[in-house]
Design a protein with these regions (language model features):
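Membrane-helix interface residues
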Residues: 18, 62, 121-122, 131
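Helix-loop-helix module between adjacent transmembrane segments
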Residues: 22-119, 188-193, 205, 276-283
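Membrane-interface helix-loop-helix modules in multi-pass membrane proteins
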Residues: 1-50, 181, 185-199, 203-247, ...
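Hydrophobic alpha-helical segments and their helix-loop junctions in multi-pass secondary transporters
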Residues: 40, 79-87, 91-106, 110, ...
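Membrane-embedded transport cores of multi-pass solute transporters
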Residues: 132-133, 139-140, 272, 276
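Small-residue-rich segments of transmembrane alpha-helices in multi-pass membrane proteins
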Residues: 59-64, 134-148, 223-227
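Helix-boundary and loop/linker segments of multi-pass membrane transporters
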Residues: 59-64, 174-180, 259-265
Length: 283
């Protein structure tokens, strides 16, 4: 969930596709459910046999070294576009938010360098803790920006959706004539994304380092994190009718556009005050 897609692709889908973007909430809430059954078994076998990769697990299960090699190659090829997408997204964010003071390429290299350093020095557990801090930070940023842009551009959620319905009623529907997505495609997007969710090689690697109990707890709690994506989608909806289509090269640029054109000093102060602990406010 917590990736550059959340801040670029998520708002972009809401801005350009409307209600079709809600499939993201569905697959994030349901994607890990199969791991409730699979995960604990993977964890136990991984600790017992000292597995490191997904290929180790499958190769041992089917007694095939050839399968280990194939899984390794497929995993590597699958990670290349995934990692490239993340690094490109960070490079773009650095470039836009620094008003070209950091170039696209330098921003991507900076993001890659930070990741390489903390993974190389801290290992798997260090990467896991970085995920925790990243999630907390992104939750805060997402809710602050989501609430701010809705209130500053429309006054309230009700006003925002009323304006969208008034200008384009089918934009908030699924499967109707004129809507951005058919019911079949919407459903298939959810199913395919759910299946893909539990096929990532790093899901196996992380399961080897934890316990069956923690895996089950994580699976049960994980749907709550879909709440994080609500304000992300609100950002995209808030931009409808505000950001001209020809102002963007592609829909994924909508959040950087809003930040650079509609985030004022008062908006930054609003974000800070929103998250000051209440005891300090009381004093």
């Amino acid at each position: 969930i917590f990736s550059t897609f959340a801040f670029l692709g998520g708002p972009g889908w809401a801005y350009s596709k409307g209600a079709a973007s809600l499939y993201i909430l569905a697959y994030c809430a349901l994607g890990l459910m199969p791991w409730y059954i699979i995960g604990p078994k993977v964890a136990r076998l991984g600790k017992k046999s000292n597995y490191i990769t997904m290929g180790d697990f499958l190769g041992d299960r089917y007694n095939s070294k050839f399968l280990v090699i194939i899984i390794g190659i497929v995993s590597l090829l699958a990670f290349i576009p995934y990692l490239t997408l993340q690094i490109k997204g960070m490079g773009y964010i650095f470039n836009v938010l620094t008003f070209d003071n950091i170039s696209y390429n330098n921003g991507a290299l900076l993001a890659l360098g930070v990741v390489v350093i903390y993974v190389a020095t801290s290992g798997v557990r260090g990467a896991a803790w970085s995920d925790v801090f990243q999630a907390i930070l992104m939750l805060i940023v997402a809710w602050v920006l989501g609430i701010y842009f809705v209130e500053s551009l429309h006054g309230s959620l009700g006003n925002m959706f009323s304006k969208i319905i008034e200008d384009n009623p089918d934009f908030l529907t699924i499967g109707n004539e004129g809507s951005k997505i058919s019911s079949a495609r919407y459903s298939s997007n959810i199913v395919v994304s759910m299946l893909g969710f539990v096929m990532w090689p790093h899901l196996f690697t992380k399961s080897y380092t934890t316990t069956a109990r923690r895996i089950k707890l994580t699976v049960l709690v994980y749907p709550i994190f879909a709440i994080f994506l609500l304000p992300v989608l609100f950002i995209g909806f808030a931009a409808i009718g505000v950001v001209p289509n020809d102002a963007l090269g592609r829909p994924g640029e909508v959040l950087p556009y809003l930040i650079t054109h509609h985030l004022t000093e008062s908006g930054i102060l609003y974000g800070i005050v929103t998250f000051i602990p209440s005891p300090f406010l009381g004093n």
